[in-house]
Amino acid sequence: AIRASHIKYGLVITEMNTLRSVQCTLDNIPQGQLKDYMLASSACFPALRPYEIAGVKYIDGGWRDNMPLELAAKMGATELIGVDVDGVGLTRPNLTGLPTRIIRSHWDLGPLFDFDGVRAAKNIALGYMDTMREFGRLGGTAYGILPDENSFMQDFAAEYQAQLSAAISRAPTLALTEALARQHKHYPAAFSENLTAPTRGAIAPLELAAEMVDVPSEVPYTPKLLALTFMGQCDKDPADRYKTLLGREEGNILGEAAMATAVPEDFVTALVSHTLSKMPSAKFL
């Protein structure tokens, strides 16, 4: 069936003894041996035994080339789409000069040899949303963000910046704290440019807060729905841990600022909760 398809197919294997990378296409794989080459290409040594073909032992092609963009270019591709699953092996620089998109996940996809069906289904859903995001069909960084409703994200971003500025006026170190939270959790800066998902920076604090309280990631959200789900996921108001920094009451500014510095993501989660509490209730209808 693969040989009869109009879609070209290729794979990479690695000679075990020499660690030489071998690029293979259907044209140079002998008839009847495709399954052998596929098994060799996926023999992830040392977890899986090397696979022998014609007296030569081979291991997973990813050891020397885990994203074979060059092979796709040689086979006639005019545009490349690579998938980075953060696996073992060597990722070679892309020297093809072709338009290229790399799809990768914000989330930990689990151990390499975890074959749990529930996790697999979740990872498939995450991969779909990562792809949709890369092609500009969804926004966000970690979550799949659907088109906005009633300018909720714009209003959230404006209120968040206002509350952040107010907190910084009480403790100037919070400017760095907020930036570190984004950096630690791999979220973009507030006004970073991104052509495929231009709203990523604005909604990043809400996504970060949602991640911190384990909002499910395998379904898409509108900004409003993500906010509502975040609030529903909180047993207690995260903002209660920083009442002084957030201007809710008088207290120990230095102590709360030190706590925020120690756990930047926790402070941003509190700030998001505080921000949402300041938004008009009509925005959540």
Where are these regions (language model features)?
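Patatin-like phospholipase
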Residues: 1-285
